[in-house]
Amino acid sequence: MSNLENFDKEIFDLTNKELQRQCDYLEMIASENFTYPEVMEVMGSILTNKYAEGYPGKRYYGGCEFVDEIEQTAIDRCKKLFGCNFANVQPNSGSQANQGVYGAFIKPGDKILGMDLSNGGHLTHGAKVNASGKFYSSFFYGVEMDGRIDYNRVADIAKIVKPKLIVCGASAYPREIDFAKFREIADSVGAFLFADVAHIAGLVVAGEHTNPFPYCHVVSSTTHKTLRGPRGGIIMTNEEEFAKKINSSIFPGMQGGPLVHVIAGKAVGFKHNLSPEWKTYAKQVKANCKILGDTLMKRGFDLVSGGTDNHLILVSFLKKDYSGKDASNALENAGITVNKNTVPGETRSPFVTSGIRVGSAALTSRGMKEKEFEWIANKIADVLNDINNTSLQSKIKAEVKELASKFIIYDKAMF
């Protein structure tokens, strides 16, 4: 009997129920992945006990000689991964990383130009309900009806707005982002260029997506999603002047003592990302997503932008009589988890939507390849083409569980 099972069986049992859900269902939420046992092992270590306010070699607390080495290792691996000169590995999340960037580069009230949330952006790119849209004067660009960014349109908006900072990057954009064009736009109006690569970072470091360096002044990311590490954030730059401002913005500006056990998890994750196997994984993520999208289009479904260049697709139901929420619920009943998502030309509320976002990273981590993704796409189509057929959903759920049992990801809940 484990310590947790003995002391708090309620939480132990719920954790194991979640393990069973992760094992039995097909996880296709684009922002989720399955991290490595080694990452979870170090995150559950005694490192959680240590306070380490400050940075390596410049701490406010004593006894930091070993955690200094851990954080410096994470920094060095991060720099090597992205090919940059400076990295801050302390942000507790991607959202905090983004707020840290704003704190370093602009002042409250300054203008920012980001991707509209309903067009594929993120809350932290200036949405009015988020701190980024409350502390700063936020303006937006979006996608055209073909689902793609029109860079000439972005340039026109930038000339009118004259932002201090432009945000490029997205949470639901299936096409490659042209950082070079964004830099031309930023330079034309004298703006800083900030790339949020949280979704595509795992592809970037494998050479499967253009690197935001040297085009961007600053880059942020999460460390989970396509990087497959622990939940957390990072900020990177090539300029020492910017690095100093970023460090001050994170500590003492936003955070106190960093989560040392998570920083260690980031270091372990980065070691995986630096391995030769990572390039193979990233290629497979893209290949799996492509056949997923191609198969759904063959079955008559509309994909935003007509396909994908990365790890996700957006399926539009604007021409259907059901919503993204309906589709998400039906698929979950069939053992497939996705999320409802707004699409270009959206007519429904953000709580209902007219689309779903579907990702390939997590199932690729389980070892699935094109054959499995083609099968899954056909099952998704079967469910959606008869969306109210609960008997069919139950039948497919059993088939999904059988497939999932052949690709075991974890044999226990705690490491």
UniProtKB/Swiss-Prot annotation:
Broad class of enzyme this protein falls into: transferase
Record-linked Gene3D superfamilies: Aspartate Aminotransferase, domain 1, Type I PLP-dependent aspartate aminotransferase-like (Major domain)
Pathway annotation from the record: One-carbon metabolism; tetrahydrofolate interconversion; Amino-acid biosynthesis; glycine biosynthesis; glycine from L-serine: step 1/1
Catalytic activity entry: (6R)-5,10-methylene-5,6,7,8-tetrahydrofolate + glycine + H2O = (6S)-5,6,7,8-tetrahydrofolate + L-serine
GO biological process, one term: glycine biosynthetic process from serine
One Pfam family cited in the UniProt record for this chain: SHMT
Top-rank taxon, per record: Bacteria
Methyltransferase found in the keyword field: no
Names of the cofactor(s): pyridoxal 5'-phosphate
EC number: 2.1.2.1
InterPro entries with a match to the protein in the record: PyrdxlP-dep_Trfase (IPR015424), PyrdxlP-dep_Trfase_major (IPR015421), PyrdxlP-dep_Trfase_small (IPR015422), Ser_HO-MeTrfase (IPR001085), Ser_HO-MeTrfase-like (IPR049943), Ser_HO-MeTrfase_PLP_BS (IPR019798), SHMT-like_dom (IPR039429)
Cellular compartments annotated: Cytoplasm
Main location: cytoplasm
Molecular-function GO terms, alphabetical: glycine hydroxymethyltransferase activity; pyridoxal phosphate binding
GO cellular component: cytosol
KW Calcium (keyword) present: no
Similarity annotation: Belongs to the SHMT family.
General function of this protein: Catalyzes the reversible interconversion of serine and glycine with tetrahydrofolate (THF) serving as the one-carbon carrier. This reaction serves as the major source of one-carbon groups required for the biosynthesis of purines, thymidylate, methionine, and other important biomolecules. Also exhibits THF-independent aldolase activity toward beta-hydroxyamino acids, producing glycine and aldehydes, via a retro-aldol mechanism.
Record PANTHER family: SERINE HYDROXYMETHYLTRANSFERASE (PTHR11680:SF50)
Protein name (record): Serine hydroxymethyltransferase
Natural source organism: Campylobacter hominis (strain ATCC BAA-381 / DSM 21671 / CCUG 45161 / LMG 19568 / NCTC 13146 / CH001A)
Organismal lineage: Bacteria, Pseudomonadati, Campylobacterota, Epsilonproteobacteria, Campylobacterales
Gene: glyA
